[in-house]
Amino acid sequence: MSKGTLFDKVWDAHTVQILPSGQTQLFIGLHLIHEVTSPQAFAMLRERGLKVLYPDRTVATVDHIVPTENQARPFADYLAEEMMQALEKNAQDNGIRFCHIGSGDQGIVHVIAPEQGLTQPGMTIACGDSHTSTHGAFGAIAFGIGTSQVRDVLASQTLALAKLKVRKIEVNGTLAPGVYAKDVILHIIRKLGVKGGVGYAYEYAGTTFEAMSMEERMTVCNMAIEGGARCGYINPDQVTFDYLKGRDFAPTGENWDKAVEWWQSIRSDADAEYDDVIVFDAKDIEPTVTWGITPGQGIGVSEVIPIPDSLPESDRAIAKEAYEYMQLSPGAPIKGTKVDVCFIGSCTNGRISDLREAAKFAQGHHVSPGVKAFVVPGSERVKVQAEAEGLDKIFVEAGFEWREAGCSMCLAMNPDKLQGDQISASSSNRNFKGRQGSSTGRTLLMSPAMVVAAAINGQVSDVRELVS
């Protein structure tokens, strides 16, 4: 059993009581809601005559269903418009702050909360979205929850949860040029598997994570769920504090000093006990690309698609399914795989630092003929900042489309979708069958820089060669 970890300290600080079931009734400090998983939850409240208990601890935005080309209302998709109107009404009726389109604050829920300073160390955070683990980058314990749990948090500001075990994942060393946080997390998921973290919270530690910016740390924690972990976190440090200071909802004055003192106290103790510890070396990580239908089916860009005999027996059935669906051959190099669509964005890689890095490689080049490439900022604030820096012009001159903020092609809930059996090079987080809108569409996950390299060459390419 873990002891003295940040997870234990934050969990204990938010424990209301131990329930007869053995679960913990856990107080939730921040509840983030969006248009997809909240309408039914609000409907259940109305059926019971209940109101939102703590509207000041609840923040709403719209992200999943919003079009990124034409955002004029009403939306062309009547179901999307219906969800939008429902969220607007539910937020207004319950006194919830709503970051609506055009407010300057709208965007993907896991992008706007950190950039506004809503996400802070030591918090418990819940959202009806799988990638809520993103907020763990700040030293928060953040869970994705289902619609019935969204209802519970709205009504009681608590959740009934079983306490998780804690696994420390340590990565040490300096990442080579062309290797990014996205490659680190894809490498970890490849090694530990998509179910390896079931029942665990992951603590990411070591010199590699310590050297990362907050936005890079968010990329890592965002995909903790893809490795089976319920949440993932990084201990807060000066990088965290520097990022938060001065943001809209960050403490100020004496309250800031008190907050930092507490944030430092919740760091995992030097002698903390973990349920498991796994260590990786940064030098073993290269630009990584997924070849299959789970985020765990990834390989270095210099490798070949694994042959069945090289895989553990337990992985062979899903590998066979992946070969057939992806129309890729075992033993073939992943490098050179043709791509049709290139997407940069999502709650994994749609922040300003992601766009800066992508623009660096796009500048002076052009998207290959026949390839559709587009960039979707993670929030309105990211879009404004990118345009102030001229990044939009770099992308457009290179042949990329420049869009409005939203989830876009990460998932098939808005107009940005693959067609037929197109292959996409995507900076998003999931490569499941049909994830990007076509039942036969295929997704290759990679870093934004690698997406640019693929767009320029029309095929999976090694971004390190683009540098040279």
Swiss-Prot record:
Catalytic activity: (2R,3S)-3-isopropylmalate = (2S)-2-isopropylmalate
Cofactor note: Binds 1 [4Fe-4S] cluster per subunit.
InterPro entries noted in UniProt: 3-IsopropMal_deHydase_lsu, Acnase/IPM_dHydase_lsu_aba_1/3, Acoase/IPM_deHydtase_lsu_aba, Aconitase_4Fe-4S_BS, Aconitase_4Fe-4S_dom, IPM_dehydratase_rel_enz, IPMI_cat
Keywords: 4Fe-4S, Amino-acid biosynthesis, Branched-chain amino acid biosynthesis, Iron, Iron-sulfur, Leucine biosynthesis, Lyase, Metal-binding
GO molecular function: 3-isopropylmalate dehydratase activity; 4 iron, 4 sulfur cluster binding; metal ion binding
Enzyme class: lyase
Required cofactor(s): [4Fe-4S] cluster
UniProt-recorded name of the protein: 3-isopropylmalate dehydratase large subunit
